[in-house]
From Swiss-Prot:
Presence of the UniProt keyword Chaperone in the record: yes
Pfam families assigned to the protein according to its UniProt record, in alphabetical order: HSP70
Gene symbol of the encoding locus: dnaK
Stated family: Belongs to the heat shock protein 70 family.
Biased composition (Low complexity): 578-590
Biased segments, Acidic residues type: 605-620
Job description of the protein: Acts as a chaperone.
InterPro entries the record matches: ATPase_NBD (IPR043129), Chaperone_DnaK (IPR012725), Heat_shock_70_CS (IPR018181), HSP70_C_sf (IPR029048), HSP70_peptide-bd_sf (IPR029047), Hsp_70_fam (IPR013126)
PANTHER family, alphabetized: HEAT SHOCK PROTEIN 70KDA
Keywords: ATP-binding, Chaperone, Nucleotide-binding
Entry keyword Cell membrane: no
Taxonomic lineage of the native organism: Archaea, Methanobacteriati, Methanobacteriota, Stenosarchaea group, Methanomicrobia
Protein name from the UniProt record: Chaperone protein DnaK
Amino acid sequence: MAKILGIDLGTTNSCMAVMEGGEAVVIPNAEGARTTPSVVGFSKKGEKLVGQVAKRQAISNPENTVYSIKRHMGDANYTVTLQGTQYKPQEISAMILQKLKTDAEAYLGETIKQAVITVPAYFNDAQRQATKDAGAIAGLDVLRIINEPTSASLAYGLDKGDIEQKILVYDLGGGTFDVSILELGGGVFEVKSTSGDTRLGGDDFDQRIVNYLLAEFRKIEGIDLSKDKAVLQRLTDAAEKAKIELSGVASTNINLPFLTVGADGEPKHLDIDLTRAQFQKMTEDLLEKTLVSMRQALSDAKLTPNDLDKVILVGGATRMPAVVELVENFTGKKPYKNINPDEAVAIGAAIQAGVLGGEVKDVLLLDVTPLTLGIETLGGIATPLIPRNTTIPTKKSQVFSTAADNQPSVEIHVLQGERGVASENKTLGRFTLDGIPPAPRGIPQIEVTFDIDANGILHVGAKDLGTGKEQSISIQKPGGLSDDEIDRMVKDAELHAEEDKKRKEDVETRNNAEALINAAEKTLKEAGDAATEDQKSKVTAAIDDLKKALEGKDSEDIKSKTEALQEAVYPISTAMYQKAQQQAQQAQQAEGEAGSHDAQGPDETVVDADYEVVDDEKRK
């Protein structure tokens, strides 16, 4: 049976896992790492780079490198420009997913066509749809979109059997924050509530350090570096490193030599000490935001901290001591640590993939919609149809009427959010139901139906109960893509994949040619009298031809000249091998003759020595 990949598509890092032998196993990437930086770049030669290689070149090429694209998923107006080409967030995310898919296929030795992808619990409909679109562009059939905290609970609770317990999952990732309350027992994972902030994560903690370093450098040197992209990239990398170090030590030194050049032409260096206390002080308001979400989630679940049985920390940012202390103080419980915060979400996604594929039995996942869904009604009021924290999939209907006499149509304005005024909520889409027969206001019966699938994606319909006429839409805008757009992007992605493959082959062809030139030149030096002058001149000419071919870009010409050089070198290499073989045989014969001479017996001139045995007792 074909494998279904479980993917944690993270803001700063991504991870993938698969079910093997009844267990979820994390798949390392091509570089051997268990997580992959969610970074995409294009080299100055136009080569697409994803993961660690993209992150490594970001300092020298910041304008063609993209970080944290997940924060812009679902934003229809956001694009990034790389090497003069504009890309939507879905396309950048698809490049990351393609990298994971390709590496997984190489590891497993089979083609991957299906996946379960996780998203923050607080992602809205547009963000979820954008994630699904990214999977499609990458060539993946996304079977399910599941919430990250819920996925982590699967990783934690799969082996807990029939033990009933209430758990809080605190998920602070690179760019998003979620907290979910779940009830586990008998193989059922039921989400009771969720809360969070899709614009809060480890990146924000890094940015506070960057702001501090910019301010200190301005104070010391009088230079503002806030507009220098290359410098900002170096500061961001240093900030992330400092944040990680401060999780284990009380103080760290941030040293960046040759950061910039002053007006006098002298290089300027940055050398600043940062203590854990300073870091915690500059980020305490960020932690306070997570506390607000924890209170909200518990309130919605109608629970108190004392009702919790376990607290699970997920996401790399939860390694910060201040986070652990905050959660422990609020809940009164030490966080459960027998789970890798970087890998738990991907493992849970693989388990859900196993459920969908029939490999994992007796597990039922009951998730919720994070935000209230409704429509705009008379006076600009937001009227809810499905309250937040409703278990999904679900379907709700409500009957509305016209606001004016003889109104021929109604516009259905679909909203997501908690505000009472329509304009303060997120618009998911609009559509019109036409053909309503003339009637006084309040008489026509318009039934509006909201249907949320297991992915948390909304479908809306409106029906005139009097005429039976109906209209429906699957919410995709803003931020979603049409089928035509997805098809175009899939083709673009496939084209890029072919281009990348060809570019890689071209590089390998050049590398092989250069290696052969070095080997051939070495062979000429060592050949001596093993080769004729005619043979040597042929090799020299072939080397010159290949060097000339390398000055151009015609790979086929390089391959042809490489083969010609191999043919020219072969006779010399063969002659040298034969000569070395003859010399070795002669040496063995010489050793054999010397050995037989030694075995003839002692020389007659050698005199054997007389000896006498002395009795020690007599000596005494």
